[in-house]
Amino acid sequence: MSVDPMAYEAQFFGFTPQTCLLRIYIAFQDHLFEVMQAVEQVILKKLEGIPDCEISSIQTRKCTEKFLCFMKGRFDNLFGKMEQLILQSILQIPPNILLPEDKCQETNPFSEEKFQLLKQEIKELQEKYKVELCTEQALLAELEEQKTVKAKLRETLTFFDELENIGRYQGTSNFRESLVSLVQNCRKLQDIRDNVEKEGKRLETQ
């Protein structure tokens, strides 16, 4: 069988010419075996009708196999010539013929060098895309962080507004004075808590 892949012919026919010829070869070979088996059965029946025949069925089988090998050799020789003729004259697309789907190659030829350049360009674009994707993810993470900081800042401003309102309620309009007053009140509360704890411990020891 031919070792030429004949890829262009396979694209057109939908099968490789070698595969087609291999199936034909197997079909002919199977038919030859079947014919020889039928001939052998006929010979054996004819021999059974001959009285005192010295030819046994084993001898008949050996002769049949020998003849089959001879026929197979002749068939292989003829099929090899037929295969060469079919592959070169029937199932081969001439080199100057383009399939309809490849007509664009005639007006826009694409060399191996251009193909490699295109692959390199695609690779560079993929790398740029990965960098852009990482940058986008970093920006999104930073944006989420800014949202968190903004929320905390709002909480802090709200807290200071509440402190200022407390100062106004106590008659202090200045924020610094309100903060000082708040600190003093906190210290007073701490002193009261300490005194309560001491008094509680003293009562427990009595």
Curated annotation (Swiss-Prot):
InterPro entries according to UniProt: Centromere_Mis12
Stretches assigned to coiled coil: 105-206
Lineage: superkingdom: Eukaryota
Pfam family, one: Mis12
GO CC terms of this entry: kinetochore; MIS12/MIND type complex; nucleus; outer kinetochore
Complexes and interactors: Component of the MIS12 complex composed of MIS12, DSN1, NSL1 and PMF1. Also interacts with KNL1, CBX3, CBX5, NDC80 and ZWINT.
Family: Belongs to the mis12 family.
Function: Part of the MIS12 complex which is required for normal chromosome alignment and segregation and for kinetochore formation during mitosis. Essential for proper kinetochore microtubule attachments.
Protein name, UniProt field: Protein MIS12 homolog
Organism, as annotated: Rattus norvegicus
Lineage, top ranks: Eukaryota, Metazoa, Chordata, Craniata, Vertebrata
